[in-house]
Amino acid sequence: AAQAISFGASAIGLVGKMPSGPGPIADELIKTIAASVPPPVATFLLTSEQTAENIVAHHERTHTNTIQIVDELLGREYGAIRSALPHVKLVQVIHVVGESSVDEAAELVDAILLDSGNPTLAVKELGGTGRRHDWKLSRKIVETCGKPVFLAGGLNPENVREAIEVVQPFGLDICSGVRTDGNLDMFKLERFFAAASR
């Protein structure tokens, strides 16, 4: 986290238990890291929980200031989360598979994050796939959504500049594109931030 912040990260994603993908860490470690991150850097809990009760419980174990919901929820769950955690920001991940990718969730959260997973598989892909999706479609979503839109999905030091120019997102979310053999690669991370800030 400290290295990412030193390179210019404005948020740190802390990955809870997931059905697939790189980087999950124990809730106790998430809590420790979140407590060490200085303001104004945001701390995002990436959770695959699908009910308000479980999401609130996950947050209470970790104490981040933002929850990134990586799977689909029923609309009523958002209201229950907001009631229980009124000062916590909610970011809904939308896996871009077509023009209908952004649904009613955009109205119920503070921001959305466009990614390239596939939640319909037997073992759900909820992020960290290293695959790009259609950035022109992502641009349409940015233009029509009315909320801040983060871009994820296959971003790396070689393509981040193009992604920014094509999509014009509010922010970027990186994972597999700055890893080597499943571990965070500081050289790739530094190159990513250098390319993104050009």
Indicate where each model-derived feature is located.
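Conserved N-terminal beta1-alpha1 strand-loop-helix module at the mouth
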Residues: 1-171, 176-198
